[in-house]
Amino acid sequence: MSSNELVEQIMAQVIARVATPEQQAIPGQPQPIRETAMAEKSCSLTEFVGTAIGDTLGLVIANVDTALLDAMKLEKRYRSIGILGARTGAGPHIMAADEAVKATNTEVVSIELPRDTKGGAGHGSLIILGGNDVSDVKRGIEVALKELDRTFGDVYGNEAGHIELQYTARASYALEKAFGAPIGRACGIIVGAPASVGVLMADTALKSANVEVVAYSSPAHGTSFSNEAILVISGDSGAVRQAVTSAREIGKTVLATLGSEPKNDRPSYI
């Protein structure tokens, strides 16, 4: 079978899956309830807020030293900052921070994506929230930590790599800062690692729905040299969701050819 025939076969399977409506819930059958809580880890430090999936640590500094603020070169200077840092995950944390700034009087002042994933193909993350009141900043970090149980729902991995999908009906300031996403419009993030998987996912997404490209990153251009391809899209909510789900199906199919079936550790939310 030629490579073109293989791609066409996979695309046909993806379109068939997306076009098939999900089974209706059986009346009377209890549905699982997803808990969204920070991990139960304790620490006596006042700066400690909590931990979460992805080796994520939430911290807050009530009164940042001015010399550190100068060295950090933040766009805006705030007396109090919140720190959301992780070994694994970039998209889930950016999406969680986006929800945090929607819910609190805080602002994302810095987003960095270190080469990490604990030796895998992707990123870690370092996100700084700023605010004039330490209680607002702490609340922002709490919201972000709790959101991670949801935003990790469409991260699928196996021994060869991972795929990641994110979706929101209304982008806010974290997505704008990270990718230039239009505020108030639906936004989707599509990630594939190895990068070859991500390129195919990106192409599938754009062919499956009428969406706009916001940003594209590849190993030498915008990914901290991780082995990923990343597409960020915007548009009408239904179209963005369609593009993201189409990319998810073809990404899972292709990644499975390199190893076991890709699995997610949290329930899918898209």
Curated annotation (Swiss-Prot):
Pathway the protein contributes to: Polyol metabolism; 1,2-propanediol degradation
Keyword GTP-binding assigned: no
GO biological process: propanediol catabolic process
One cellular component (GO) term of this entry: propanediol degradation polyhedral organelle
Ranges where the record places region Probable helix that binds cargo to the BMC shell: 6-18
Location of the protein in the cell: Bacterial microcompartment
GO MF annotation terms: structural molecule activity
Domain BMC circularly permuted positions: 47-152, 154-258
Modifications after synthesis and translation: In purified BMCs seen as a 28.0 kDa and 25.0 kDa form, both of which have been N-terminally sequenced and whose N-fMet is removed; the smaller form is called PduB'.
Tree of life domain: Bacteria
Induction context: BMC production is induced by growth on 1,2-PD vitamin B12 medium.
Keywords: Bacterial microcompartment
Biotechnology note: Artificial BMCs can be made in E.coli by expressing pduA-pduB/B'-pduT-pduU-pduN-pduJ-pduK (in this order). Enzymes can be targeted to the BMC, and appear to be encapsulated within it. Upon overexpression of PduB or PduB' and mixing of the resulting purified sheets with 2-ethyl-1-hexanol, will form closed shells. Enzymes (tested with endogenous BMC enzyme DDH and the peroxidase activity of cytC) can be encapsulated in the shells; the enzyme is active in the shells. The shells are permeable to a variety of compounds, showing they could be used to make protein based synthetic bioreactors.
Record has Nucleotide-binding as a keyword: no
Cross-referenced Pfam families: BMC
Disruption phenotype: Releases increased amounts of acetaldehyde when grown on propanediol. Cells do not make BMCs, diol dehydratase is found in diffuse aggregates near the cell pole; it was later found this a double pduA-pduBB' deletion. A deletion that prevents synthesis of both proteins makes no BMCs, about 20% of cells form amorphous polar bodies. Grows in an interrupted manner on 1,2-PD and vitamin B12; grows for a while then stops, then restarts as if a toxic compound was accumulating and then decreases.
Mutation effect (I10T): Makes about 25% BMCs, 35% diol dehydratase content
Chief location of this protein within or outside the cell: other
Note: Bacterial microcompartments (BMC) 100-200 nm in cross section are formed during aerobic growth on minimal 1,2-PD-B12 or anaerobic growth on 1,2-PD-tetrathionate medium, but not during aerobic growth on glucose, anerobic growth on glucose or pyruvate-tetrathionate. BMCs can constitute up to 10% of total cell protein.
Subunit (UniProt): Homotrimerizes to form a pseudohexamer with a central pore. The trimers pack into an array.
Family the UniProt entry places it in: Belongs to the EutL/PduB family.
Function: The two proteins produced are among the major shell proteins of the bacterial microcompartment (BMC) dedicated to 1,2-propanediol (1,2-PD) degradation. Required for structural integrity of BMCs and to mitigate propionaldehyde toxicity. The N-terminal 13 residues are important for correct assembly of the BMC shell. The isolated BMC shell component protein ratio for J:A:B':B:K:T:U is approximately 15:10:7:6:1:1:2. The N-terminus of the long form (PduB) is required for correct formation of BMCs, deletions in the first 37 residues have substantially reduced levels of the major lumen enzymes.
Free-text comment about domains: A probable alpha helix (residues 6-18) probably binds to cargo enzymes, attaching them to the shell.
Name assigned to this protein: Bacterial microcompartment shell protein PduB
Annotated source species: Salmonella typhimurium (strain LT2 / SGSC1412 / ATCC 700720)
